[in-house]
Amino acid sequence: MIQPKEYFERFIAWKRHPDPKSPKVTYESYSAMDLNMLTHEMDFGIPGALEELGERYLFGLGLSTDVDKALELFQQAADAGHPDAYHMLADVYRTDQHGRQDLDRYFKLLPSAAERGSWKSMFNLACAYYRGKLGYDGHGYNLDHAAALEWSLKSAEMSRALLEIFFARPCTQDLRDYFGDVYDTFVRAVYSAAKQYMDGDGTEKNPDKARELLTSAQEFHKTHLHSECPQFAALLKKLAENG
């Protein structure tokens, strides 16, 4: 699986030099590139540019909506190893938003996106295993709460590692918007995994593991966001009350 540092530096962000006379850089999102710059980077096969241009075609952001073109660009970015492109190749088929809903195809592609390192696909896969086929009108996977726990933990690990890199680098607002989604998934993944440990759901009941997971995540939250996460605090309080 991809390492978080490569994920961040090769696929999520690019380096902007605000001052040509200074070696200092700011990390920027590909979404900040104008169309000319994005097309130029795409011509050189830059995965982040390919993925971003795919999203612009998919959602009609400054371009005419073209789902086929979007899929072509996502595939090129995925071939270069971009985890988010793998996620998009699956997610296009999750709903009818783009006129391509095909849940069987979505669930066929989702594990590959998760295995390639997509933090979002990892958690979506956890949810799919937790809900089972009944949660998706007969589509998807057999109920498997143990697998759900495994993928929630992997999503929490990847999203936390990416957040650590983000907090350590000078980043622009556009990149902060992306990492807002990473943060939300981190909280949901930690909460879900801790709850399963607390309830013995898909695993042996293990309040110590739940407490360890939540305490570590809460300390991370305090260090970087200077506040407690209310979701983590609620579960830690429940653990304390139950002894």
Task: Annotate each language-model stretch with its function.
Residues 49, 85, 121, 182, ...:
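The tetratricopeptide repeat
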Residues 144-161, 208-223:
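TPR/TPR-like (Sel1-like) alpha-helical repeat modules
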